[in-house]
Amino acid sequence: CFYTWETRTRTVDIENGDGAVTSTVEEYTVAVPVSLYQAYANLEAELGRTITEDDKSNINHIYSMIAGAAGGGNYNGEFLRGDGSSIDLDISAFTDPNSKNAADLVTYAIHAWESGWGYVWGTYGDVLTESLFAYKLEQYPDGVGSYEDFIRANWLGGRTTDCVGLIKGYGWLSPETMTIDYGTHGMPDIGANQMYYSATESGTIDTMPDIPGLAVWHDGHIGVYIGGGQVIEAMGTKYGVVKTELAGRGWTHWLKIPYINYD
């Protein structure tokens, strides 16, 4: 009910026994969330009846677990917005632009915060153009459409992301072109919960080691721990990318993000 499958291609570098590297193009399949309205229609077709408001409530809950919470809810605790407005991507402080590592994930997240990135469900760091905004309105008529006026007034023309998109955007960033290329560099397109459940190293928040670049998670939401008891997170449509304190934010678990090097 919630996904459609798409076949895409990617370039993979393979190191041969003699140390030479060759590139090959391979096909891969990704699961892409359908729009919320399409999920309603799919369930009606599956059940053979008109769905009820209770059905829709259940779908909304499952959908947010898959794709992340759309508006981010309300938060009354302290948070700090970055004061920048740049759309430039800056990797000058990366330790190793050619690998996907925890230190550079932290640098990337801090850059997104300092640059004042906004929040739009289903985005991952690209500039929110009129055409991209129109596509997201069609794709997520509730999750994005409900905030259309706010997004247009506050985020249009700047870079935007959602919570897990902040991590995926780093994974998909190609340093040679300085573009965020969907589904590349071994980072799949997965939601916050899928990222948590696919981790091989994780634990409850009270067991969290002090390692910058870990992700912190609760059901439907994920952020990047940057050290010093602080987190960068794409909090929600009305907040954008913000800095918060780790303690008291409701995080339940930590994880080493799959596809990120922590050595």
For each feature predicted by the language model, list its residue ranges:
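Intrinsically disordered, low-complexity segments enriched in small/polar residues
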Residues: 15-17, 46, 65-71, 75, ...
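...with weaker cross-activation on analogous glycine-rich loops/strands in unrelated enzymes
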Residues: 94-106, 115, 156-158, 168, ...
